[in-house]
């Protein structure tokens, strides 16, 4: 192995641990850098240990059922030989229909497993700058150190790195009531690009009062300071509390919007149809399956968001794939910077995964680590990188983050709204998700079996675990 330059993985979270394992299992040396050290009292504001793959929030990887987004991703990762999912299965604790783990045992076991691998060198200490040479996988997460963040900032450019996630809810398009919502742009300028949910005065006042009274989630201390310096992150509930009409002069502004189904908006008999306020939704993906509630960045608790936002006419049955959030979250503008292989466009030997690239959730971070690690070792071996089938949950997620509109890019969790449509529509949602699952797992099986080298790599990973 003297002639093999080790691949460097920066960050020992879920993505980094998975990436390092895939590299090592392929027979290539890897240096896994982890900044945290209990002995040296060097931890992040959110971490409590220096173990690899520490779960800092929930101990749950999400729903187990494979006709759910998280569960399908679990199933795909099992096929691909993921060490994270294997250890999650081993250390599972009862949690209803979710895959939850004993987080202490889970992280300790992964740390021991990686440290004992002959191809893995675990280095404790901060990496203050992006390495210039060799193949590198960046998985430093949402709490990347200040020095490395500055190095990444210089590499990506000022406009392509975010430090605070203030995002509006994202809704499944087919759950929006089109009998109420209408397509239009303000003053009919250009293409009808927005779905508009009109409110009369009574509806608006009820919504405003509910929003003012709704319960907020508390920002952590280290997030409060960041929020002070984030331009334009005023939560919709704070805007509501500033006055009854504040939202009507902001994101719920009604001027220039009229439902053409009523006819000419100038006609006197149609004056009664002019909305008092309008909530707008902007298309989030190319296929128009996901819609973003414009200007609704919020710090409300998730249950409150669903209750209050479903008061908006047309959103009574809205299905949320991502709730609004406001928290510290260092992430890059992936559509501008990354290929679906998770390589940086301007430096193909630098790859990234985890929350840093705008995927949300433990399982998505694991999937990103799998792909980035797999492609890193393929590049080191002189092979072409691979992309996962877009019909899979993992493949569709990486296709989405690398092809979304850069201007409005916000992190995305796994969800069925980003998977390509079926050839024939299945009306029942649960049945449709089951068909998505069957197609995804069949396509992934065929994909794994296609290139002989790749088949051997995945088979070796699965067998040796």
Swiss-Prot record:
Localization in the cell: Cytoplasm
GO molecular function, one term: tRNA (uracil(54)-C5)-methyltransferase activity, 5,10-methylenetetrahydrofolate-dependent
Disulfide feature: none
Cofactor(s) the protein needs: FAD
Top-rank taxon: Bacteria
Residues that hold FAD according to the record: 11-16
EC number annotated for this UniProt entry: 2.1.1.74
Reaction(s) catalysed (UniProt annotation): uridine(54) in tRNA + (6R)-5,10-methylene-5,6,7,8-tetrahydrofolate + NADH + H(+) = 5-methyluridine(54) in tRNA + (6S)-5,6,7,8-tetrahydrofolate + NAD(+); uridine(54) in tRNA + (6R)-5,10-methylene-5,6,7,8-tetrahydrofolate + NADPH + H(+) = 5-methyluridine(54) in tRNA + (6S)-5,6,7,8-tetrahydrofolate + NADP(+)
GO cellular component: cytosol
Function: Catalyzes the folate-dependent formation of 5-methyl-uridine at position 54 (M-5-U54) in all tRNAs.
Family: Belongs to the MnmG family. TrmFO subfamily.
HAMAP family xref list: TrmFO
Protein's UniProt name: Methylenetetrahydrofolate--tRNA-(uracil-5-)-methyltransferase TrmFO
